[in-house]
């Protein structure tokens, strides 16, 4: 009996060691990886202090303070900070934004799934189903834009308070001195558009710069799909020897913007361009908006047709237009060229066929 028991023990052997369980990635980890990958210009998985400073400089922290922060995260003092360490550092400081970033990651997956399905099924769907799809996309965009506006308002307010001065004063100073960091350049073009009722002590949505970027990314993706689903075409027909009348509505304004996009930023720029064109085309005083891309390079020409100059100038101050101008700062190889010209309003004939 003892031999049988010993034989059983030998056959069974010791229990297999349990495999260690890998914990799920922390909320926002994937988002941070994507963000810091863009900051890593040479794609070596690390940030030098120069790369760190170029990306994080906001005009508030001094270079010495940024160096102190960099050294505090880079505990080995290698002067090359691994992006994973940056992810871990910010993950420990998420606070109330932990569920926000987790929701953004879930939203990103859900939107991509919905868009892929829409691209496959839209053309074969009935007219009613196509109408419903466009309606749902528009409403989704509206909800995201509302959240984005709240985030941008909070962001602008906090940055203004951090500088201890009004944003319009910051804009004037930024225009009168050499351009600093990428983020400082963005502020120089940002309009005074925050909600006046929001303050850091209020209970409304707070600031999360990465959350703001993700909301804008989702809006751009949805707007790009809407732009693919709907299209209108204009034509101009001049009359001969026409007697022109004077007045604010006697001429239309055509604005031409020429841009040269960096090759590695084409995808992000195209999304932002589609978002801007969709928003602009929906304005009541905008007659038409269209864009052309050169086949042999990354050059684009954007055309906007407006009922009058005043409407176009008001549009230039809108949050969407300001966001597009910030995109130009980030993604262009050289400053854009903007030209405006007036045409007799009677030349404009809209082709609805």
UniProtKB/Swiss-Prot annotation:
Modifications after synthesis and translation: Phosphorylated by NEK2.
Q: What quaternary structure, including any partners, is listed in this protein's UniProt entry?
A: Interacts with the N-terminal domain of APBA2. Interacts with NEK2. Interacts with APBA3; APBA3 seems to mediate the interaction between NECAB3 and HIF1AN.
Report biased composition (Low complexity) as residue ranges. 193-203
Q: According to its record, what are the GO cellular component terms?
A: cytoplasm; endoplasmic reticulum; endoplasmic reticulum membrane; Golgi cis cisterna
Function according to Swiss-Prot or TrEMBL:
Inhibits the interaction of APBA2 with amyloid-beta precursor protein (APP), and hence allows formation of amyloid-beta. May enhance the activity of HIF1A and thus promote glycolysis under normoxic conditions; the function requires its ABM domain and may implicate the stabilization of the interaction between HIF1AN and APBA3.
Q: Does the keyword Calcium apply?
A: yes
Enumerate the spans annotated as EF-hand domain.
27-62
Subcellular location as annotated:
Golgi apparatus
ABM domain sequence ranges: 253-342
The organs and tissues expressing this protein are described as:
Widely expressed, with highest levels in the brain.
A molecular function GO annotation: calcium ion binding
Keywords attached to this Swiss-Prot or TrEMBL record, sorted alphabetically, are: Calcium, Golgi apparatus, Metal-binding, Phosphoprotein
Q: Does the keyword Phosphoprotein apply?
A: yes
- Residue ranges, annotated region (Disordered): 193-213
The entry's Ca(2+)-binding residues are: 40, 42, 44, 46, 51
- One GO biological process term: protein metabolic process
User: Compositionally biased, Polar residues: which spans?
Assistant: 204-213
Q: What is this protein called?
A: N-terminal EF-hand calcium-binding protein 3
Span list, region Required for interaction with APBA3: 172-181
């Amino acid at each position: 009996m003892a031999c049988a028991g010993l034989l059983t023990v030998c056959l069974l052997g010791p229990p297999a060691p349990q495999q260690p369980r890998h914990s799920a990635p922390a909320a926002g980890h994937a988002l941070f990886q994507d963000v810091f990958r863009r900051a890593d210009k040479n794609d070596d998985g690390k940030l030098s202090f120069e790369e760190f400073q170029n990306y994080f400089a906001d005009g508030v922290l001094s270079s010495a303070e940024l160096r102190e922060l960099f050294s505090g995260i880079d505990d080995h003092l290698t002067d090359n900070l691994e992006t994973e360490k940056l992810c871990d550092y910010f993950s420990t400081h998420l606070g109330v934004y932990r569920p926000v970033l987790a929701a953004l990651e879930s939203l990103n997956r859900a939107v991509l799934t919905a868009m892929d399905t829409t691209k496959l099924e839209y053309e074969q769907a009935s007219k009613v189903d196509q109408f419903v799809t466009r309606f749902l996309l528009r409403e989704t965009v509206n909800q995201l834009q509302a959240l984005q506006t709240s985030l941008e308002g909070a962001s602008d307010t906090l940055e203004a308070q951090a500088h201890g001065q009004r944003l319009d004063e910051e804009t004037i100073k930024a225009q009168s001195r050499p351009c600093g960091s990428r983020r400082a350049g963005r502020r120089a073009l940002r309009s005074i558009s925050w909600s006046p009722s929001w303050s850091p002590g209020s209970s409304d949505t707070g600031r999360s710069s990465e959350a703001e970027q993700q909301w804008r990314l989702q809006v751009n993706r949805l707007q790009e799909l809407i732009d693919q689903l709907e299209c209108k075409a204009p034509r101009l027909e001049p009359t001969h020897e026409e007697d022109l009348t004077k007045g604010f509505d006697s001429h239309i304004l055509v604005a031409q913007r020429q841009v040269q996009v960096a090759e590695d930023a084409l995808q992000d720029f195209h999304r932002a361009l589609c978002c801007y064109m969709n928003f602009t085309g929906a304005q009541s005083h905008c007659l038409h908006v269209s864009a052309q891309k050169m086949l042999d390079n990354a050059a684009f020409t954007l055309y906007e047709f407006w009922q009058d100059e005043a409407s176009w100038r008001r549009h230039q101050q809108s949050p969407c237009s300001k966001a597009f101008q910030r995109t130009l700062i980030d993604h262009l190889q050289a400053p854009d060229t903007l030209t405006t010209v007036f045409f007799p309003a009677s030349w404009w004939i809209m082709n609805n066929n």
